[in-house]
Amino acid sequence: MSSNWIFKVIVAGAGGVGKTALIERYVSGSFLEDHKMTIGAQFSVKDVKLDTGEDVRMQLWDFAGEERFRFLLGDYCKGASGAFICFDITDYSTFEQLPEWLRIIRENAGMIPIILVGNKYDLENHEIELATADDYAENAKCLMNVFCSAKIDLNVEPMFSAMAKWLIYYANLAD
């Protein structure tokens, strides 16, 4: 499929929140129980045809969440069209790290569209409520917040499609 649009999208957030699992679910439709820790960054591509009829190539940059790799993120952000910042809804400490991820991305990529992603909805003991994350997303000038689960495939494809549509919208505004 030849793509009308090609977008570089950063996927960032604390270690262990499920960034790689979300990308794997979206790109291949599968969920692996055993994920190896991402070292630096991994790159995946997904070609999609949106319900609008447009062909989009999503270049997904899965960035390691561990503190020791964070200094690299600024370089990976350059040229990004959009970003997902992920947190684990069962671990409040990952939600508390959102301001740092936002700062790094905005300092290096500007005011690109960002979607906050609360992953692991399939698990019990949610420590972050949807309304809290929605308020944070609004105050941080993010496009939206999405609660999802890579494991049970809840809201994964819709959040990536929403990002693609927003990126096309903003690209058309810039023309």
Q: What residue spans do the PLM features occupy?
A:
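TRAFAC-class small GTPase G-domain
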Residues: 1-175
